[in-house]
């Protein structure tokens, strides 16, 4: 049995051999079925699936996206089952399948960490999940999670720098930023040494290199400058101020939820786990679970299915 998480940008797979992550942007007509075909060992292979890619703007509404993903997966794995926000498995496209990946993670971890707050910080978003409130989490849509502070649209790679940073201070001068798509989270985190070029798995805004010099040039454009105008230190100031804002936003929300739950226990998964676990004095699930923590929903839905005897 394999676990599959179909996101808007990434396809994550967990099987007996480990974790497999493919950059697979649905808005560019990503070949989900072709990517999955390589993991088929027999026609009767079982697969359990979660998704969040139904929100991609190539679909006119969520049910269109859900149906597309279900059909694409079933072409590779005809017996696939899909986990929903009702904490149940389904064999057909239903509304409950929309953005249920975070709930699978919660369902898997709640027994071992019943009083913890889970932060899953990925390429695009941060899921903030109070495991102590699992019963209240069922049925929550992304809209409701945004309204409750359980979903923050900022991650380690794909977010527009200007979305969090309307202005920066350069040499003591407050400088508005351009809202153009010039630089992303990955550029700031690469410049600050939080990630490596190999971790920069998404496309760059300018479709150019994924290295320090290229990231610094993209960061300079956020203030409508060439790198020569503001220098390396100026670009690093932009990166540092972005990180400060992102850290305040995400860590502040996590601490608020933990306080409401009366707990000091915080566990962290995803590509940003090492960084945010340090900031929050939390437990890095990469150390507890290994590489599967970077594809936690795919791993979790597989474990839930095995634990529940669904197959």
Task: State the predicted function of each range.
Residues 124-128:
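Glycine-rich anion/phosphate-binding loop at the beta-strand->alpha-helix junction
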């Amino acid at each position: 049995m394999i676990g599959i998480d179909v996101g808007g940008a990434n396809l994550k797979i967990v099987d007996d051999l480990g974790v497999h992550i493919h950059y697979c942007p649905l808005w560019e007509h990503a070949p989900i079925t072709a990517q999955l075909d390589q993991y088929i060992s027999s026609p009767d292979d079982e697969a359990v699936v979660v998704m969040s890619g139904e929100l991609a703007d190539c679909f006119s509404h969520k049910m269109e996206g859900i149906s597309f993903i279900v059909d694409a997966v079933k072409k590779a794995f005809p017996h696939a089952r899909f986990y929903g926000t009702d904490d149940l498995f389904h064999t057909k496209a239903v509304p409950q399948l929309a953005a249920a990946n975070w709930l699978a993670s919660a369902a898997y971890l709640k027994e071992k960490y019943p009083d913890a707050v889970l932060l899953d910080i990925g390429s695009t978003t941060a899921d903030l999940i109070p495991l102590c409130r699992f019963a209240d989490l069922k049925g929550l849509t992304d809209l409701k999670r945004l309204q409750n502070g359980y979903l923050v649209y900022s991650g380690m790679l794909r977010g527009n720098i200007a979305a969090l940073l309307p202005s920066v201070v350069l040499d003591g001068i407050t400088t508005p930023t351009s809202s153009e798509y010039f630089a992303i989270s990955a550029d700031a985190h690469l410049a600050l040494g939080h990630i490596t070029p190999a971790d920069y798995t998404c496309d760059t805004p300018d479709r150019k290199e994924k290295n320090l010099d290229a990231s610094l040039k993209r960061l300079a454009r956020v203030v409508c400058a060439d790198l020569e105008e503001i220098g390396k230190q100026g670009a690093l100031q932009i990166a540092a101020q972005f990180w400060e804002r992102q850290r305040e936003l995400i860590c502040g929300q996590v601490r608020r939820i933990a306080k409401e739950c009366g707990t000091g226990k915080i566990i962290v998964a995803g590509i940003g786990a090492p960084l945010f676990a340090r900031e929050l004095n939390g437990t890095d699930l990469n150390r507890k679970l290994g590489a599967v923590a970077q594809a936690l929903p795919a791993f979790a839905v597989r474990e839930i299915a095995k634990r529940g005897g669904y197959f």
